[in-house]
Amino acid sequence: MFSLKRQQGARFEYQARLFLESKGLQFVAANQSFSCGELDLIMRDQDTLVFVEVRQRKNAVFGSAVESVDWKKQKKWLNAASLWLAQQNRSLEDTDCRFDLIAFGKTTQDLEWIINFLD
């Protein structure tokens, strides 16, 4: 049985996927785990692979969802993407890709999409 926190995380990840699909992106994979971290969603926007981090914060007591993606998390995100691409016999250098953030507030309707968050 998944914990309540994990169930809520899965719900927000699914809502992020639906939102991105409504914007024309195609689903590639979800919850890809590596020793260095996890990729929440991998989507395709035409010829571009999009590695999506999904964050949610009920309130800003410990910072917003956007603020929670610090440099340590960004490094893990890049490393996980690099490992996933290596499994596909590709690399960050030879693949058109970007890193987007979907940040939720308290509800699934409170959504912010930041394209090229790591740009």
UniProtKB/Swiss-Prot annotation:
InterPro entries named in the record: Restrct_endonuc-II-like, tRNA_endonuc-like_dom_sf, UPF0102_YraN-like
Highest taxon, organism lineage: Bacteria
Disulfide bonds: none
MF GO annotations: nucleic acid binding
NCBIfam families, sorted: PRK12497.1-3, YraN family protein
Family: Belongs to the UPF0102 family.
Name recorded for this polypeptide: UPF0102 protein PM0647
